[in-house]
């Protein structure tokens, strides 16, 4: 059965246009949501913590900038787009004391609601609007008259308006131009975390590093190893994004395609799939989130230790040197770039 997909013709933009929306956070997604909502005729204010470096950017863009608490008190709909690990504290300290009956609290990701780290009162609508693309793409597509597909969900709906309100919001940021897919907080959260951990971040990251180690330990030059197991990955991913795995195989040489069919299952075999299932179980039963919370409460020490270990891997030095040769590659970690 085809998944339900909603478009502009299904949405009532006047619903969100009749609300005051506070965007908490002015990062990649916060900036895009705020700009698109404003361009769609919605009254928007930005909520930021005292001393935030984003205040000047938001003010230069012409937004009313308030503290998180002031924004929560002012708004009818509050979209919490701060980092996952900061959201519970922001909610407890700034948002919860200022919520009123009938307010709506929205999220761009379901983690804090699904795992009970944030528990709004029963008279608050809890919704999610999650564009499936980075903020700069959400904004650029909107300006071009297009949009990025969005997921929407409602976890708590005391007034029976959650679906219409989230759909209206999604339409206002351009999502309904491309397609809006209703889901649940549970499904969005668990699939998102699994994708990040088993494939997109954890899986690919360690596949690259292990491939680099195999080649260099066999005596090949680090530069050659980097080109073959890391640099060319973007070419492959772009082909998959554009037309699926079939398109990638079609676009590769017969040698690469044949070798991939033979060796892929040797590297990613049934035992890997079983361990991926273990990762999913840890997500579903809350094991991962408990460790995430413990890390935050411990001052991010475990995260910093893990980050330092990966950042010291030899592939990082090799990659940095080679990227200096590539005029078309911009290093986002280089503030002068």
Curated annotation (Swiss-Prot):
**Domain of life, per the record?**
Bacteria
Write out the catalysed reaction. Answer: (2R)-2,3-dihydroxy-3-methylbutanoate + NADP(+) = (2S)-2-acetolactate + NADPH + H(+); (2R,3R)-2,3-dihydroxy-3-methylpentanoate + NADP(+) = (S)-2-ethyl-2-hydroxy-3-oxobutanoate + NADPH + H(+)
GO terms for molecular function, please?
Answer: ketol-acid reductoisomerase activity; magnesium ion binding; NADP binding
Q: Which residues bind substrate?
A: 253
**What are the binding positions for NADP(+) in this chain?**
26-29, 49, 52, 54, 84-87, 135
Gene3D superfamilies given in the database record: 6.10.240.10, NAD(P)-binding Rossmann-like Domain
Pathway this chain belongs to: Amino-acid biosynthesis; L-isoleucine biosynthesis; L-isoleucine from 2-oxobutanoate: step 2/4; Amino-acid biosynthesis; L-valine biosynthesis; L-valine from pyruvate: step 2/4
Which residues participate in Mg(2+) 1 binding?
192, 196
> Which InterPro entries has this protein been placed in?
6-PGluconate_DH-like_C_sf, KARI, KARI_C, KARI_N, KARI_prok, NAD(P)-bd_dom_sf
Q: Which residues participate in Mg(2+) 2 binding?
A: 192, 228, 232
Cofactor stoichiometry and binding remark: Binds 2 magnesium ions per subunit.
* Residue intervals passing through the bilayer: none
Query: What cellular component GO annotations does this protein have?
Result: cytosol
Q: Name one GO biological process term.
A: L-valine biosynthetic process
Query: What is the active site of this protein?
Result: 109
UniProt function note = Involved in the biosynthesis of branched-chain amino acids (BCAA). Catalyzes an alkyl-migration followed by a ketol-acid reduction of (S)-2-acetolactate (S2AL) to yield (R)-2,3-dihydroxy-isovalerate. In the isomerase reaction, S2AL is rearranged via a Mg-dependent methyl migration to produce 3-hydroxy-3-methyl-2-ketobutyrate (HMKB). In the reductase reaction, this 2-ketoacid undergoes a metal-dependent reduction by NADPH to yield (R)-2,3-dihydroxy-isovalerate.
HAMAP family, alphabetized: IlvC
- Name the UniProt record assigns to this protein: Ketol-acid reductoisomerase (NADP(+))
The gene from which this protein is expressed is: ilvC
